[in-house]
Amino acid sequence: MSSDRPVALVTGANKGIGFAIVRDLCRKFLGDVVLTARDESRGHEAVKQLQTEGLSPRFHQLDIDNPQSIRALRDFLLQEYGGLNVLVNNAGIAFKVVDPTPFHIQAEVTMKTNFFGTQDVCKELLPIIKPQGRVVNVSSSVSLRALKSCSPELQQKFRSETITEEELVGLMNKFIEDAKKGVHAKEGWPNSAYGVTKIGVTVLSRIYARKLNEERREDKILLNACCPGWVRTDMAGPKATKSPEEGAETPVYLALLPPGAEGPHGQFVQDKKVEPW
């Protein structure tokens, strides 16, 4: 029996920015907050830690690389809540700069999670987002830098207002293939696998926002990509300038855009401001 209680869900939330987003939503969101993580024991540990702070998130396992895991989460949300009000796609990976793993493997592995995993979550969960829902895809300003390092031809494609999801998938796969052949630079790609995957996330967000306008305009769902900033996490390291709490500010702002807000929608947002793409 599903309840009418609102529910927010954050992926990749057992540590870092995701964990800080859950903490902030527990304090500000009027409803249940579901913390998800790939590793059950780490997820439960994270929930316990928040419980010691007097907060009460729920936990559900989610590996965004595993379609079965995504579907199990969707079924849980439908059964318990009849859908989803707020989705924050935060799960992602990056190789360290000094990592010796060959570039083409880094490209494939990073793309699998950051782009295709996020796309798979959206495919399953966007259809169950309730009216006035909010969707936040955590991207990165690295995507803007990577975009500016692309060939003019690629930049034009990624900035297009009419690019389709299929065309974007084709480009992401081409990057992996070009990296395997060692011709990615010659083909106009930047030298950052992480950056290209986050171009994918930002452009995917623009495509999905457009689709929502076409198919569900009256539902007033707002979907955006954002950059949390350079945040001290396992991923970015200790020299980064922002705390995870500061990194959570923009994603939480977008997750809690008030009912009736007209925007932002389909934008790339940094420090609560829309950045030109």
From Swiss-Prot:
Positions of the catalytic residues: Y194 (proton acceptor)
Entry-linked Pfam families: adh_short
Gene Ontology terms for molecular function: 15-hydroxyprostaglandin dehydrogenase (NADP+) activity; 15-hydroxyprostaglandin-D dehydrogenase (NADP+) activity; carbonyl reductase (NADPH) activity; oxidoreductase activity, acting on NAD(P)H, quinone or similar compound as acceptor; oxidoreductase activity, acting on the CH-OH group of donors, NAD or NADP as acceptor; prostaglandin E2 9-reductase activity; S-nitrosoglutathione reductase (NADPH) activity
Superkingdom field: Eukaryota
Residue sites binding NADP(+) per the record: 10-34, 63-64, 90, 194-198, 231-233
N6-1-carboxyethyl lysine PTM sites in chain numbering: K239
UniProt key word Cytoplasm: yes
CDD domains assigned: carb_red_PTCR-like_SDR_c (cd05324)
Annotated positions of the Phosphoserine modification: S2
Catalytic activity, EC: 1.1.1.184, 1.1.1.196, 1.1.1.197, 1.1.1.71
Record GO biological process: epithelial cell differentiation; glucocorticoid metabolic process; ovulation from ovarian follicle; phylloquinone catabolic process; positive regulation of reactive oxygen species metabolic process; prostaglandin catabolic process; response to estradiol; response to gonadotropin
Keyword annotations from UniProtKB, A to Z: Acetylation, Cytoplasm, Lipid metabolism, NADP, Oxidoreductase, Phosphoprotein
Principal subcellular localisation of the protein: cytoplasm
Subcellular location: Cytoplasm
Residues the entry annotates as binding glutathione: F95, K96, V97, Q106, A193, Y194
Disordered: annotated segments: 258-277
Residues annotated with N-acetylserine modification: S2
Gene3D superfamilies (UniProt xref): NAD(P)-binding Rossmann-like Domain (3.40.50.720)
Gene Ontology CC annotation, any one: microvillus
Residue sites binding substrate per the record: S140
Catalytic activity: a secondary alcohol + NADP(+) = a ketone + NADPH + H(+); prostaglandin F2alpha + NADP(+) = prostaglandin E2 + NADPH + H(+); prostaglandin E1 + NADP(+) = 15-oxoprostaglandin E1 + NADPH + H(+); menadione + NADPH + H(+) = menadiol + NADP(+)
PANTHER family documented for this protein: CARBONYL REDUCTASE 1-RELATED (PTHR43963), CARBONYL REDUCTASE [NADPH] 1 (PTHR43963:SF2)
Biological role: NADPH-dependent reductase with broad substrate specificity. Catalyzes the reduction of a wide variety of carbonyl compounds including quinones, prostaglandins, menadione, plus various xenobiotics. Catalyzes the reduction of the antitumor anthracyclines doxorubicin and daunorubicin to the cardiotoxic compounds doxorubicinol and daunorubicinol. Can convert prostaglandin E to prostaglandin F2-alpha. Can bind glutathione, which explains its higher affinity for glutathione-conjugated substrates. Catalyzes the reduction of S-nitrosoglutathione.
Family statement: Belongs to the short-chain dehydrogenases/reductases (SDR) family.
Assembly: Monomer.
Name under which the protein is recorded: Carbonyl reductase [NADPH] 1
Organism: Rattus norvegicus
Lineage, highest ranks first: Eukaryota, Metazoa, Chordata, Craniata, Vertebrata
Gene field: Cbr1
